Amino acid sequence: MKKPLNIKKFLLPNIPYVFIALFATKLGQAWRFAPGMDFSGKALHLMEGFAAAFQSALPSFHPIDLCVGVAAALLIRLAVYVKGKNAKKFRKNLEYGSARWGRPEDIAPYVDPKFENNVILTQTERLMMSNRPKDPKTARNKNVLVVGGSGSGKTRFFIKPNLMQLHSSYVVTDPKGSIAVECGKLMLRNGYKVKIFNSINFKKSHHYNPFAYIHSEKDILKLVTTLIANTKGDGKSGDDFWQKAETLLYTALIGYIHYEAPEEEQNFATLIEFINAMEVREDDETFENNVDLAFKELASREPNHFAVRQYKKYKLAAGKTAKSINISCGARLAPFDIQELREITMYDELELDTLGDRKTALFLIMSDTDSTFNFLISMIYSQLFNLLCEKADDVYGGRLPVHVRCLIDECANIGQIPNLEKLMATIRSREISACLVLQAQSQLKALYKDNADTIIGNCDSSIFLGGKEPGTLKELNQALGKETIDTFNTGESRGREVSHSLNYQKLGKDLATIDELAVLDGGKCILQLRGVRPFLSDKYDITKHPNYKYLSDANPRNAFDIEKYLSTRLVPKADEVYEVFDAGRV
């Protein structure tokens, strides 16, 4: 299909040549008015012809004069065209690069005039929370990559200032539990529902049961995938046969528990009991344990049951192989042999699927020295993203009423979140964002391999707080680009006479060299926002935030007592109606 001719685009550049043609008609008129019969005579008296022709300012419309005007305009147009084709392309003062540091006017279109409706990036730069600004060109996702070495202030200069904005629901990874203590009272003061999951001290934690969020067969597969990705089995290194076999068994058992067990038994404790009951006799292939009998009974009722189909595939393994699979499953679920962990996963209090309904603060406290139970944090994030995306699509027409921000401190230490590279690209439209906080970009690459670049690419904002990891410094150096600078050289030659020389030239220089990045001032940071020049700015001064006075940093009396908060029991009111259930005999 041919594109329609753009008349406007064709006419506008040629309008000046119309005036040239009209003016050039005077040349033809002057030649005609000049006295003389031949060329030499007319050339001799040409000035008289010009005087006669320019007695009137109007162009001549004599046919000969019009031909002269058109010819002159065409010649000039041709000359301009030829010169343009052969023109040299100069970029004055940009010969070796155009990199520069950002200025206030560069960030201005991306900032919401209302301070609390922004993501705090640096002391002078912010990013509006709205995903649909008036000017679509300024729309950016709220995913942020924060990189900074130990002690660079990732929590103080980024996580806590953004928590104090109070414009969203927050899910905060909290190494050591300090953020919850310092900010918990602020959240309660502003009407937030506060939830705590503590993998360091289970006695100071709400309960979390992954089984509570299983609503379909695909939810079972997602849970098993997360469990496999973040726990260690006993299979042979480099052989994924054992993982696939374990996946079949986990899927079958969890499917059975979800569809057949009473609600109070749908938890990891029941799963452990199932695995413990799976006795295998290598010398008797016909032996059936209690789990075999349970599935046999289910198959008699529902031959095409999801759990039955998975279990039949598992039972294809010979006795010795099945025993190895069971051992591998037992090793993977060994942490659940701890009574405290079994108890904390008996039922659910986190209500992950409600984070987008009302303002909630969920603090995920984990150890920064021992990763034994960090797989639970990864499991929470995996279920959280999937639950909120599904609820946004199925209930709210694609967008959650309350934005959910995940501030994932020590992102590399919580384990792998399956399909994070896809989630980072799709959660924006559902009013969800993720801030990945790392000590070095190499941590992300070690965990997510080839998908790390995709994850980084889906973060429109990135902040470097300082560090000395070579890979991070090299990538940042390349991303900042080169600027063009002026240099001069002086020379002196001595002989019979002394002569001096001075030469000026232009060179390309890195906007920030690797050694400059390595010794970055502790109070400075580098912000990169997609489509905007990078900013060399001060880190945010947390003491200047309007809500700082409500943190325990400002006043120790504002410290949030987690144990006291969790021990609070409901006090019934006289005018309220409650449902009472009989738990039965224990």
Predicted regions and their residues:
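Conserved long hydrophobic alpha-helices within structured protein cores
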Residues: 115-121, 375-383, 476
